[in-house]
Amino acid sequence: MNFLNKSLIRDSVVLQNRWKIIMKVSLNWLKELAKIEIIDAHSLANKLTQAGFEVEDVEMVNIDGHKDYILDVTSTANRSDVLSMIGLSREVSALTQADIVKTADIPSAGLFDNISTIISDDSLLNCSYYVSAIMDNIVIQDSPKWLKNRLYSCGFISQNLIIDISNYIMLKWGQPINIIDLKKIADTNTESYIEITSNFCSSKQKSVKLDNKDIALSRDVLITQINNNITSIAGIGINQEFHVDQNTKLIFIEAAIFKEAVVRKSSRSIGIRTESSIRQERGLNIDNGRSAYRETLSLLIELTHGKVKATFLKKETENSTLNIDISLKKIQDVLGPIKDNHTVRFLSFDEIENTLKSLQFKITKKDVKKFNVIIPSYRKYDVFREIDIVEEIARVYGYNQFQSKIPKIQFTKHPSSRRNFIDQIRNILRNLGLTELVHYSLVKSKGEINLKNPLIKDYSTLRSSLLEGLINASAYNIKQSNQTVDGFEIGTVFNLKRNKIIETTKLAIILGGSLDIRSEWSEPAHSLNWYEAKGIIENFFRKLNKSIQWVKRESSNDQINFIQNNKSATLTYNNDNIGLFGELNELTSSQFGFNTELFVLEIDLDILQYSDPEINYLSYRIQPYSKYPCITRDLCIVIPKKMQINSLFQLLNQFNDNDLENMTLFDQYSNKLLGNGKKSIGLRFTYRSDHKTLTNLEIDNKQNELQKNIIKKLNLEIRK
């Protein structure tokens, strides 16, 4: 033989970190299984790539004077059926609309006549299919040239006739075949009783030799035994002690299909993946296993002149067929129109039927719109849903044959009142200069509702408040030497109430943290204070047309411990508690590294929207702007600490001066000189007339009258 490229040779053992297997596919062998004489290797590679396979290389080789092309093909993990030449030939015939060459019927006469034992299910654990035979009078000769060429083209080196036949069958049918030297097992021959079992390792069974390595066994490893001798690690490899050699005369042939999860667990436990284990892990087909076993015996009889003396068979489970109902409309809706001479049309039933039949799917038409699809047993691992059939049609027909334009959908449904309400809140807050923030619904801290099996410890609890995310985001910005952001978040929080999880939509706002607040350009910048932050919140509710009441907060009524008691308030709407507003306390600010005041708000949007079934609009006074200038006067008043500023403003408005345009608070402080329970506030009064310019004398008279009313009627002290 003239081997020109040694890169074809592959290792028999694949390392555990290999997640995929690359099949070396001989084009000449493929042409014998499917009628694709016309197509060339590169065109075939393109078709396979478009159908979801990876063709990593196409290489021309010369094997024994014959030119061949070798394709390195990788399939997805769920396509166990294409890990064989038979399976790949089915795929290629569907993609190229070629016929499959019917494999020659393998004679079964004499192969199964001497069934000596039916093996019980209890003896073979985790095994869905098992058949074996004993053959004697074996004469091991040199492998025929055609067999060596087949193996070499697929990356295998010829070892001896028995092993070559085993590898050839695995490449052709995808079914691993174990063949061992039965004479090397003590107390076994064709006449004596043979016990075949598969079970998990016991503590006494320490190791097995595979590929010149001692493999330590654990209780997770499934093994097969003959008369209590470990013959193989189930689905992975044969015990090297029982390998066949040139002197072998009596052999034991075994074809088995084990549960995928068990083989996968055994493979991970010992750290080895083989050609056999990869196929077992992905799932094998009983029909292919039966054909592979029969052809193995046929080749052994033909090439070694051996005779079958006994066979062993586990009662086979029936290959259940999968029936899937699907409608023509479903296929057309998912795939959309196809490209057909600039006209828009959809796949017809005949086109769909031909495509599915090329995949060996059986079609039964129920009516004009629906039909039933029977899935072949070798495709049960990847086609078991309606959408899988749609994907197969698109894959074989050609993804590029469908129009890629996304269809336009006409939405006739109007947004809900809920959606409009949330959008209105977003627009108002954005217009006020706030940035919308979004955080995960899962948080690190332990709360009422914890996940049983979280992927990450940092995200193991459903959040019960939005404030934690906003505070953490501000702290992260500071750590990155960035400024904090005045932001808001609208999201869902979760709480337990009477052992039921209650979902609530809330709004949270965070303000402050930066030194860039100034009322005039000439003033030095300062951080946001309580009154400015409260003014932003009041402005928000005013624009939202919601009349909110500010009530003194009772800290015992909530579990929030990071807000100052004397700088916080409970917000109510129609006498319903909707949330709170306040400044972070010093302990929290120091823990997170905040150097300036930060203010937070959290309210319940469900209560805010649905508290009153009737819409109560705020009353407005509409009047034209005055074209005359304003004049301001400042006044310091000593009031009780418990008096609320809003209450004072309402009392002052009772004096009914039409020229008094506005009152604002600009300062407050308290000390011992003022007396216990008292504080001094600075108020700025703005006067403006609608029909003339006010003089200083007129303003002074109005201000003096106001001071008299404050002293006499309100019994308050004016500080000079």
Curated annotation (Swiss-Prot):
Tell me the protein family, please.
Belongs to the phenylalanyl-tRNA synthetase beta subunit family. Type 1 subfamily.
The record's InterPro entries line, in alphabetical order, gives:
aa-tRNA-synth_II/BPL/LPL, B3/B4_tRNA-bd, DNA-bd_dom_put_sf, Fdx_antiC-bd, Fdx_antiC-bd_sf, Phe-tRNA-ligase_IIc_bsu, Phe-tRNA-ligase_IIc_bsu_bact, Phe-tRNA_synthase-like_B3/B4
Name the gene. Answer: pheT
Q: Which residues form the signal peptide?
A: none
- CDD domains per the UniProt record, alphabetical: PheRS_beta_core
Task: Write down the chemical reaction(s) this protein catalyses.
Answer: tRNA(Phe) + L-phenylalanine + ATP = L-phenylalanyl-tRNA(Phe) + AMP + diphosphate + H(+)
Binding residue positions for Mg(2+): D382, D388, E391, E392
Q: Which residues form the B5 domain?
A: 319-404
* Name of the protein this chain belongs to: Phenylalanine--tRNA ligase beta subunit, chloroplastic
Transmembrane segments annotated in the record for this chain: none
Uppermost EC category:
ligase
The record's Pfam families line, in alphabetical order, gives: B3_4, B5, FDX-ACB, tRNA_synthFbeta
* Localization in the cell: Plastid, Chloroplast
Q: Which domain of life is it from?
A: Eukaryota
Co-factor: note: Binds 2 magnesium ions per tetramer.
Q: Which GO terms describe its cellular component?
A: chloroplast; phenylalanine-tRNA ligase complex
